[in-house]
A protein has these predicted regions:
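Sensory/regulatory domains in signal-transduction proteins
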Residues: 1-123
Length: 123
């Protein structure tokens, strides 16, 4: 449950944390909090925008399927995605998506943490 998470205990990981509000799947998944590393890798801050508008990765349908698994099936999802960046380097992103619930039943937020590694330029 959301009440079980203390943001102060997550301070070390805040740059890689993203929180998405779930109002209605898939069109009302809204970025509530986006860590500084997530903003840097994306090149802009998607806070307040929908996942459909501002998703990060190579395949929107796969990304939405990850959210569906978390929201509808209440599963933890791990994802690996080698995404080419604007400067020709690959950003290898490892992501974990966790369901959060205010009432212990319905998922109303998704807590995401990701790490990236830059790889050699694409020639």
């Amino acid at each position: 449950m959301r009440a079980d998470i203390d943001p102060a205990e997550l301070r070390t990981w805040l740059p890689g944390i993203v929180i998405v509000d779930v109002a209605h799947f898939p069109d009302q998944l809204v970025y509530r909090l986006v860590g500084t590393r997530a903003v840097e890798v994306r090149g802009s801050d998607p806070t307040g925008k929908t996942v459909v508008e501002r998703y990060f990765g190579t395949n929107r349908d796969e990304i939405l399927e990850n959210y569906r698994l978390v929201i509808e099936e209440r599963r933890v999802v791990y994802d690996f995605d080698p995404t080419p960046s604007r400067d020709g380097f690959f950003e290898e992103a490892e992501t974990i998506l966790l369901p959060l619930s205010s009432d212990g039943a319905k998922v109303d937020k998704v807590l995401i943490y990701f790490e990236t590694r830059r790889r050699t330029p694409v020639l």
